[in-house]
Regions:
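A conserved beta-strand-loop-helix scaffold within acyl/acetyltransferase catalytic domains
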Residues: 1-168, 213-214, 246-253
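Conserved GNAT acetyl-CoA-binding A-motif
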Residues: 1-2, 182-193
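Residue-level detector of anion-binding/catalytic polar loops
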Residues: 69, 188, 205
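C-terminal catalytic domain of photolyase/cryptochrome flavoproteins
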Residues: 81, 88, 94-97, 185, ...
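Short, hydrophobic/aromatic alpha-helical segments in well-folded domains
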Residues: 89, 107-111, 174-179, 195
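Conserved acetyl-CoA-binding loop-helix of GNAT-fold acetyltransferases
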Residues: 165-182, 191
Length: 253
């Protein structure tokens, strides 16, 4: 069982499954002071500490001064040419790291045909030509970490790639543009996945996630259970350590 809520986890433990606790990094569309959704991207920036706010503004300025603009497309507004360009970028990202892409063009063709409304593409253009892009998934499905409300719209990201190198373009395409889109469209949360404490500088904060597992071999299951107990203590300490590194301003700052 993956990404269950507390009730799911309790039921699984009662059934004899072994719980595992991990950490992901999520952004919430919620002002830390008022609790209301952010009014716009500037409102989000204003909630950050001065150094984090300054760094993001510098990054965005570099991309703008490089002559790069962005185009957003969702669902059927993502054209076949857009999907083809995305796959070129996606494939290049993997090849640059010496790996073959694990999703095929046929997969994305199926997504465009059967689940178009669940995808948003951010295309970076310079001189009228596309040079990079990122792709996020969007869903109102509550099947994600923590058992969130079904009425919430959640974004999941992201795939990315570039055919040209531009300073800070990765941050703009993968974080600033998607977060801006989420704010404008009332998305409750952007789940950035596991790993990467650097995501905290973009206000993606650590969140505990939960899974449960069963192994048929008693000896192997016992060894894994002992490991998970040690790992759980480490995860608790890790979350406590990260808790003091919030990028948001304190109420009195």
């Amino acid at each position: 069982m993956l990404f269950g809520d507390s009730d799911d986890l309790t039921a699984c433990e009662e059934a004899g499954l072994m719980p595992r606790h991990q950490v992901q990094f999520h952004w919430k569309n919620q002002h830390p002071a008022s609790g209301a959704p952010f009014a716009d991207f500037d409102d989000f920036l204003a909630a950050l500490t001065q150094d984090k706010r300054k760094k993001i503004r510098q990054e965005r300025r570099k991309v703008l001064e490089a002559g790069v603009t962005f185009r957003w497309a969702r669902g059927t507004d993502i054209t076949p040419a857009d999907w083809a360009f995305f796959y070129r970028c996606y494939e290049r990202t993997y090849l640059e790291h010496g790996n073959a892409p694990y999703l095929s063009p046929a997969f994305f063709d199926a997504m465009a045909r059967d689940m178009a409304s669940h995808w948003v593409l951010f295309v970076a253009e310079r001189g009228g030509a596309p040079i990079a892009c990122s792709l996020i998934a969007v869903s109102a499905d509550p099947a994600s970490a923590g058992g969130q409300n079904a009425s919430e719209t959640v974004a999941y990201g992201r795939y990315w790639g570039a055919l040209e190198r531009v300073d800070c373009l990765h941050f703009e395409a993968c974080y600033h543009q998607p977060l801006d889109w989420c704010i404008r469209h009332g998305v409750a949360r952007f789940e950035g996945g596991a790993q990467g404490e650097h995501k905290m500088a973009r206000a993606l904060l650590p969140v505990a996630t939960h899974s449960a597992h069963w192994l048929a071999h008693p000896g192997f299951a016992d060894a894994v259970a002992r490991f998970l107990a040690r790992e759980s203590a480490g995860v608790d300490g890790y979350l406590e350590q990260l808790d003091g590194r919030s990028p948001f301003r304190r109420p009195d700052a």
